[in-house]
Amino acid sequence: MESFKYCFDNDGKKWIIGNTLYSGNSILYKVRKNFTSSFYNYVMKIDHKSHKPLLSEIRFYISVLDPLTINNWTRERGIKYLAIPDLYGIGETDDYMFFIIKNLGRVFAPKDSESVFEACVTMINTLEFIHSQGFTHGKIEPMNILIRNKRISLIDYSRTNKLYKSGTHIDYNEDMITSGNINYMCVDNHLGATVSRRGDLEMLGYCMIEWFGGKLPWKNESSIKVIKQKKEYKQFIATFFEDCFPEGNEPLELVRYIELVYMLDYSQTPNYDRLRRLFIQD
């Protein structure tokens, strides 16, 4: 008879643990609910209790990504869904803590323009919601944007940032330790500033460029060269797109999106509707 490793979450639900999906700062395991099914439809993210990012992520799921709040927000705006995973379990042992979400599929790699436009709208909707709750995601990059059954999901809420202090938008200060993939990092983050709303949207823009078939010209460069190029390209957007799309096939919607995002001040509220309309197809 086959033996299984298993654990219980804080609600007493039993989870059967499968193979490792990823091992880094945290570990991801395939998990399933019962012994009769052979499909591992869920993912467990587990780490030592001393690892603060996972604790922050769990707290963010509980306090900010509340299903009732999300449902009310989307219903008021006539939005089908946000790219936010549902939380299925939280648990802890003496030394470790974990949470469980659905297996959300693979990294989004679009095969047609329609799926790109839909993903852009969904991601703008999702960031607008997160920002409306007083936070930024802080780590928008392709590895954190997944797709399964044509549904986009944004994962990894371990680097979220509070936008307000005592009701006032945080000041721009270059006093943070940077983290994340330098290719998609916003300029503010490169310089040590907390990611604000414009930073989330800037990082999404770099993802969009690749989704539309372009390339980021600073890939494979050192971190110093990457930030230098990004700062220069913000001043010369036409040159930026010439280098991203050498064949001259850059979508005008994407160019306008980047222009609008680059014009935002650090504490400015973006015009999400204007950004969204760029990618809504009739």
Swiss-Prot record:
Coiled-coil segments on the chain, per record: none
Record's keyword annotation contains ATP-binding: yes
Residue ranges constituting the Protein kinase domain according to the UniProt record: 1-282
Taxonomic superkingdom: Viruses
Cell compartment(s), UniProt: Host nucleus
Lineage of origin: Viruses, Varidnaviria, Bamfordvirae, Nucleocytoviricota, Pokkesviricetes
InterPro entries reported in the protein's UniProt record: CK1_Ser-Thr_kinase, Kinase-like_dom_sf, Prot_kinase_dom
Reported regulation of activity: Both catalytically active kinases B1/VPK1 and host VRK2 repress B12 inhibitory activity in a B1/VPK1 deletion mutant strain.
The protein's assembly and partners: Interacts with B1/VPK1. Interacts with host VRK1. Interacts with host VRK2.
UniProt entry keywords in alphabetical sequence: ATP-binding, Early protein, Host nucleus, Nucleotide-binding
Residues at which ATP binds: M1, K30
Primary role: Pseudokinase that plays a role in viral DNA replication repression by activating the antiviral protein BANF1 and inhibiting the activity of host VRK1, a cellular modulator of BANF1.
Name this polypeptide is given: Pseudokinase OPG198
Family to which this protein belongs: Belongs to the protein kinase superfamily. Ser/Thr protein kinase family. Poxviruses subfamily.
Cellular component GO terms held in the UniProt record: host cell nucleus
GO molecular function, a single term: protein kinase activity
